[in-house]
């Protein structure tokens, strides 16, 4: 059988990042074009509507950084909500915590889940068979609207970059509703874009979260497959966040299972805000 290699590129502001390899699947869902390619270095990689979402090589930079600063620092974590996350990586990191009773994963595009289960099995791993994980094919904005007050202990927003499909996940009204359905000590954890490639969106997210939550903190790290390679995650709450704990038994247990995240990595990442972002936030 002949394997045909081709280049697949993401274009961004006059630059492009491409992977060469065999296209394993290319199809249009109800919402977007979905491609999975097999690359010699990055392994299998997922692209949605021309944007790289994840790859087997570097997905843990993203998923471990989104999940563990929140879950390792909060005592009560019975109910967890994941908005997006159809590749399964965020759920995989969540199921490491036995205290969690239920994980609602709300993904608008069922095809992303189906394709991830088939072609990117390593990312979701055991999460797909964990009985605590409940999958809902639904609009995340509408799901949050119909959820009762003070229900979730942690909300993860694991969505794609702002687009026609996801714009409302970055809106004031959405963050306000997320705050409403969080418990008193709950944490909202969201990917907050790149301070380089998506600077204006990044600053907008940070300012909006500061408007609705008493406390918010942002960490920076690397996701090589994304434009510019630097990414961010922001954590917001009404209570003081304990994201810089150095002696946390929960964190020490979890980091043994991680490739990227540990407490030292996290503590440094929370101190990496570029000065141009600091100036913008203070202006």
UniProtKB/Swiss-Prot annotation:
InterPro entries: PABS, PABS_CS, SAM-dependent_MTases_sf, Spermi_synthase, Spermidine_synt_N, Spermidine_synt_N_sf. Its EC number is 2.5.1.16. It holds the Pfam family Spermine_synt_N. It catalyses: S-adenosyl 3-(methylsulfanyl)propylamine + putrescine = S-methyl-5'-thioadenosine + spermidine + H(+). One of its GO terms (molecular function) is spermidine synthase activity. Catalyzes the irreversible transfer of a propylamine group from the amino donor S-adenosylmethioninamine (decarboxy-AdoMet) to putrescine (1,4-diaminobutane) to yield spermidine. NCBIfam families: PRK00811.1. This is Polyamine aminopropyltransferase. The gene is speE.
